[in-house]
Design a protein with these regions (language model features):
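Gram-negative bacterial Sec-dependent N-terminal signal peptides
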Residues: 1-21
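Mature extracellular/passenger domains of Gram-negative fimbrial/pilin and adhesin proteins
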Residues: 3, 20-170
Length: 170
């Protein structure tokens, strides 16, 4: 009888179907650094992580919106010991050769042009060039500054996207 029960359990487990509810990818993004100085994003002087790019005509470039990363607590942590060091802002997300791609809106060929404005060498952030070096001491003064512009493509519609950033001090 015991053997019959074991055989029945094995047979039933082989016949049971499996179901998968959902699957996807998770990206983990972080830094290990000898110095820490947390930054907060500011747009037009206001602390926020939302950059409102406004409205732009098809095939046109929108207004420049300033985006600056400043020390959350300029007098705390290691923020005061950054003189002579480099702060690297690395970006990840839907980067293309032109900039940051649209992820959820209908304007599928539009993108954001994100350009550093007070880096050691100002540059556009793209898939092939996604890290920008700054004089680290700027984090407690003018900040690590960028400008963002919406570049409209030929398709009209809304634009929604997100990009992750990480600041490393060396």
């Amino acid at each position: 009888m015991k053997k019959l029960m074991v055989a029945s359990a094995i047979a039933m487990s082989l016949m049971a179907g499996s179901a998968m509810a959902s699957q996807g990818d998770v990206q983990f993004f972080g830094n290990v650094t000898a110095n820490t100085c947390d930054v907060t994003p500011e747009v037009d002087g206001n602390v926020t992580n939302m950059v409102q790019l406004g409205t732009v005509s098809t095939n046109d470039t929108g207004k420049e919106i300033p985006l600056v990363f400043k020390a959350t607590n300029a007098t705390g942590g290691d923020c005061q010991s950054l003189t002579g060091k480099t702060a690297t802002v690395a970006w990840a997300g839907p980067l293309t050769d032109q900039g940051i791609a649209n992820q959820g809106g209908l304007a599928n060929d539009a993108y954001v042009i994100l350009t550093s404005t007070n880096a050691k060498s100002n540059q556009a952030v793209t898939k092939g060039d996604n890290a920008v070096d700054f004089d680290a001491a700027k984090v407690t003064t003018a900040g690590l500054a960028f400008k963002a512009q919406l570049k409209g493509g030929s398709t009209a519609g809304d634009f929604r996207s997100a990009a992750a950033y990480a600041v490393t001090y060396q």
